[in-house]
């Protein structure tokens, strides 16, 4: 059977829609879950198109529009774009296309990094599309004057994390090649500019050592979601823990296993298919 729509009334806890190209956005979802347990969460992992970071901004924008439409159709009242690439490619356009829906996106945490660096050198690990987007350039221009910004795209890292190999030999090699040149230039603060990367935090910290601060923006994004919910009068701080519903455009069975492994939780996972440029939910036999 299909997952039921999640109808919303003013007396209910407003459902929160969250999406990413894969499991990366779960790093954001877990913080939202911890801060807003009384709100239903609807998460979509567009794993058939992962990674977004090597795709054109136009492609990512089209995916983001349709995923947003799908999540709203499932009852989401607020959309968290838990993907740096999708935020860079589509956040502004999404707000124009869906003017009645509040959006929370991922902004590279350059501002806190620039304010706390002592060496004046900040590293950013992100995807090519994130660096190409106007959002990154704008954040650097506004908040990192006088700070040296070192960038690395970590090619192949998202794929390794999606495969559950964030601590594997290949992921370690990718990260070492990205981070070692930064260390040689006295970097003392590194920003994780992709929501997949917090799942490789142990490996990153082993390479950087204790003297480098690694900034994961996920908790700040969750706090912003709380502020937006409060602003719209939708915040429900007490009540029973509401359900989490997951959708994937790839294998629901594999995603169920990944979620259990990385979050130590079990949630219902439903399959959706891209039919042309439209997402269609697949019948599921329970």
PLM features: residue spans?
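Non-catalytic structural scaffold of enzyme domains
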Residues: 1-286
């Amino acid at each position: 059977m299909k997952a039921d729509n999640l109808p919303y009334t003013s007396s209910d806890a407003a459902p929160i829609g969250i999406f990413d190209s894969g499991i990366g956005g779960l790093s954001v979802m877990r913080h939202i879950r911890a801060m807003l347990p009384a709100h239903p969460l609807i998460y979509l992992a567009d794993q058939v198109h992962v990674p977004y970071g090597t795709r054109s901004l136009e492609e990512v924008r089209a995916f983001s529009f349709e995923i947003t439409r799908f999540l709203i159709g499932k009852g989401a009242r607020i959309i968290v774009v838990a993907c740096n690439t999708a935020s860079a490619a589509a956040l502004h356009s999404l707000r124009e296309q869906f003017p009645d829906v509040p959006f929370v996106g991922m902004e590279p945490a350059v501002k806190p990094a620039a304010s706390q660096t002592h060496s004046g050198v900040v590293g950013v690990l992100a995807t090519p599309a994130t660096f190409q987007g106007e959002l990154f350039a704008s954040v650097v221009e506004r908040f990192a004057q006088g700070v040296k910004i070192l960038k690395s795209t970590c090619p192949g890292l998202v794929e390794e994390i999606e495969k559950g190999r964030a601590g594997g030999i290949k992921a370690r090699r990718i990260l070492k090649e990205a981070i070692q040149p930064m260390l040689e230039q006295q970097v003392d603060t590194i920003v994780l500019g992709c929501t997949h990367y917090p799942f490789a935090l142990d490996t990153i910290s082993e390479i950087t050592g204790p003297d480098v601060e690694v900034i994961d923006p996920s908790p700040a994004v969750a706090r912003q979601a709380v502020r937006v919910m409060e602003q719209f009068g939708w915040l429900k701080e007490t009540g029973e823990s509401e359900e989490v519903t997951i959708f994937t455009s790839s294998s629901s069975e594999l995603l169920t296993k990944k979620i259990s492994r990385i979050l130590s939780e079990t949630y219902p996972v439903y399959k959706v298919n891209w039919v042309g440029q439209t997402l269609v939910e697949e019948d599921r036999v329970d």
